[in-house]
Design a protein with these regions (language model features):
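Flavin (FAD/FMN)-binding glycine-rich loop and adjacent Rossmann-like elements that form
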Residues: 1-174
Length: 174
């Protein structure tokens, strides 16, 4: 609850600045009519899978034989990687749009060192920059569907998630 209040304070403080600083006359007639009741965090723990998806994979449109999800409707974007209160390093910000769809490999959805641990969503095996394009709800949903299907296949075939990659990836991709 304390963090929620802090985050809402930052949001309302930024809105107050935009509306009342005089530096944004185009905002004079704008209103803030809705704010989510639970502010979300962009970053979370990310686990290490057999493959760590990175920025180059996304920008060079690397093809993966074990692709289970696709993205590209949103750009790569980074801002304030150290957090909004970090005054030790300058804030960075960039957007890079995609020319076509990128692929997310199944190997990002299971642990490289813990049997039967799978993940989907913001905790998948990606770098900080790759997360900026893979964190979106639709892509997380695709990864969740793939992880759930793979988990069912693990039970059916009596194999680990890695076993699905080695023997049954084409069936998972159907």
């Amino acid at each position: 609850e304390e963090n929620r209040h802090k985050l809402l304070g930052y949001l309302y403080g930024a809105w107050d600045y935009v509306k009342n600083s005089g530096k944004f006359p185009e905002a004079a007639n704008l209103v803030l009519d809705w704010v989510g009741s639970v502010p979300g965090r962009r970053e979370s723990r990310r686990f290490m899978g057999d493959y760590i998806l990175n920025e180059n994979d996304l920008t060079k449109f690397t093809h993966f034989d074990d692709a289970i999800a696709y993205g590209g409707g949103w750009s790569l974007d980074e801002h304030c990687p150290g957090g909004i209160l970090n005054d030790k390093e300058p804030a960075s910000y960039f957007h890079q749009r995609f020319e076509k769809m990128f692929e997310i490999p199944y190997r990002c959805l299971y642990s490289k060192n813990i049997d039967n641990l799978m993940f989907a969503g913001r905790n998948v095996s990606v770098t900080h920059i790759a997360l900026s394009a893979t964190r979106l709800i639709a892509i997380c949903g695709l990864m969740g569907q793939a992880a759930g299907t793979a988990a069912a296949m693990c039970m059916e075939y009596k194999v680990s998630p890695r076993g699905i990659y080695k023997k049954y990836i084409e069936e998972l991709q159907e």
